[in-house]
Amino acid sequence: MASSSSSPTPSAAAAVSPLTEEELTLTVKWNGKEYTVRICADDSVAELKRRICLLTTVLPKRQKLLYPKIGNKLSDDSLLLSSISFKPSLKMTMIGTVEDDIIVDQAESPEIVDDFELGKEEAVDVKDKEVNKQKLRRRIDQYKINLRTPCRQGKKLLVLDIDYTLFDHRSTAENPLQLMRPYLHEFLTAAYAEYDIMIWSATSMKWVELKMTELGVLNNPNYKVTALLDHLAMITVQSDTRGIFDCKPLGLIWALLPEFYNPGNTIMFDDLRRNFVMNPQNGLTIKPFRKAHANRDTDQELVKLTQYLLTIAELSDLSSLHHSRWESFSQDNVKRRRQE
């Protein structure tokens, strides 16, 4: 990752020209260099920032985009680019600096907005919208999963969020281990026997690697992490009632590693239900782990979920399970499903 300098905050100028009604090409000048950014008109400002981050390493939350005669519209991450009249003669300006060192202070970690629940019918609608499918296909073409350890044939896949799932990222402590969810290593050790493990966070890869290293997850002798995914793997989807928001499409993993993972052998834990709106059948909404100092002696979520994971691992296909009822699932359910 490029390092920041002591020079004044760099700015980026972008000229745009349409290739088709759907695709835009932005020439971005940043820090003395020019980059070409291709983006579709049905993408959002959030996606534009994500693309710029991929090229410049300026995190989306550090970017300020300016464009003549539209006021502060570009401060709205949910705004669709199709609503802006780009002209080749005008330039967009991005103000932002590269972060060389991540601030470990928990108050500096990314904000998590309140979760909301989509109705069952609308969740299906979001998943099946052609515009959202197109966004997923584009992300599949753009993103590369770097494997830390080889995928294991015959193993199921467990995808885990970080913030409020494995770690209380808002409380403060002298040692990050004090904010780790209880029984994390025992949980991952047990799960690893039946599942490959991937960590997917809505933050930068640098922050993911730092946090997982601090918690002792990446160098644990009892289990291995197959891959880490960051915010660049996410997509922005459109909902009729909730507008535009980011989510984590498991279809990305299934498309890039089809010989190992599929809807029938994958489960994802996240405290935000909307993150698996593109694959609701595979998501389990975990109880958020907040206020670690007050709750770490009583939180048993990972203990109970360990039993659930090991129980359903006996099934050949997980796609028919209702993970919202996981607490009432038992060995008897497995036997009954085998007999069906």
From Swiss-Prot:
**Xref: PANTHER family:** UBIQUITIN-LIKE DOMAIN-CONTAINING CTD PHOSPHATASE 1
Please give the cofactor(s) recorded in the UniProt entry for this protein. Answer: Mg(2+)
The UniProt record lists the keyword Nucleus = yes
User: GO CC annotation: what is one?
Assistant: nucleus
Ranges for domain Ubiquitin-like come to 24-101
The record's note on its domains = The Ubiquitin-like domain mediates interaction with proteasomes.
Organism encoding this protein = Arabidopsis thaliana
What EC number(s) does its UniProt record assign?
Answer: 3.1.3.16
**SMART domains in the cross-refs:** CPDc, UBQ
Q: What is this protein called?
A: Ubiquitin-like domain-containing CTD phosphatase
Any one Gene Ontology MF annotation carried by this entry is: metal ion binding
Write out the residues that bind Mg(2+): D161, D163, D271
Q: What is its main location?
A: nucleus
Record keyword Nucleus present: yes
Q: What positions does the domain FCP1 homology occupy?
A: 151-312
Top EC class, one word: hydrolase
**What are the disulphide bonds in this sequence?**
none
The entry's keywords: Hydrolase, Magnesium, Metal-binding, Nucleus, Protein phosphatase
Q: Which reaction does it catalyse?
A: O-phospho-L-seryl-[protein] + H2O = L-seryl-[protein] + phosphate; O-phospho-L-threonyl-[protein] + H2O = L-threonyl-[protein] + phosphate
